[in-house]
């Protein structure tokens, strides 16, 4: 049976994760949060004092990427994420770990090490894959390719609300600066830079609600022959 694949790419804070989860639930597909993999690897390398030694200890870092001990569990509260048996669901969503992930994602050898792990998520009946290069690199054969974007300012505002909702301190100027820096790093990296696939459906969510974007996505996906 052919596995149907929906990709959602876009910059940090555009709403990819929330909408990918909604689509996966709607179509009863598997879900890949590729950003979580990079965050988990970044966190693991930081814990092992390797994040600042990527160049000098690259082989060791690649081995960590290949042997990353991770587990995803679905619960009533959402998806729980474990690293080496420890629940790191909240930890990996912090700005600091997001910066770790961006550093890791800029290293071609580490991206390659995570390539097959991501491909393995494509199982019947289908997959919703959320990331930066899902359509351009990991799943170019996807049935439906969505590129979700929004202005840096609107993404910063959303991120502040998200962090405050988690009980974390967040300053809009710091968040905006981090988003702009990550955008630049993601778009200018040599391997798999952040950009929409040539045949992607582009949605700017700056002035749209989650429900409005979700409807646009479902209409598009259904037009690409993926049925509910």
UniProtKB/Swiss-Prot annotation:
EC number(s) per entry: 2.7.4.25
MF-aspect GO terms: ATP binding; CMP kinase activity; dCMP kinase activity
Compartment(s): Cytoplasm
The keyword DNA damage appears for this protein: no
Reaction catalysis annotation: CMP + ATP = CDP + ADP; dCMP + ATP = dCDP + ADP
Keywords linked to the UniProt accession: ATP-binding, Cytoplasm, Kinase, Nucleotide-binding, Transferase
InterPro entries, sorted: Cytidylate_kin, Cytidylate_kinase_dom, P-loop_NTPase
Predominant localisation class: cytoplasm
Keyword Transferase listed: yes
GO biological process, one term: pyrimidine nucleotide metabolic process
One GO CC annotation: cytosol
Positions bound to ATP: 10-18
UniProt cross-references to NCBIfam families, sorted A to Z: cmk
UniProt similarity note: Belongs to the cytidylate kinase family. Type 1 subfamily.
Record protein name field: Cytidylate kinase
Species classification: Bacteria, Pseudomonadati, Pseudomonadota, Gammaproteobacteria, Moraxellales
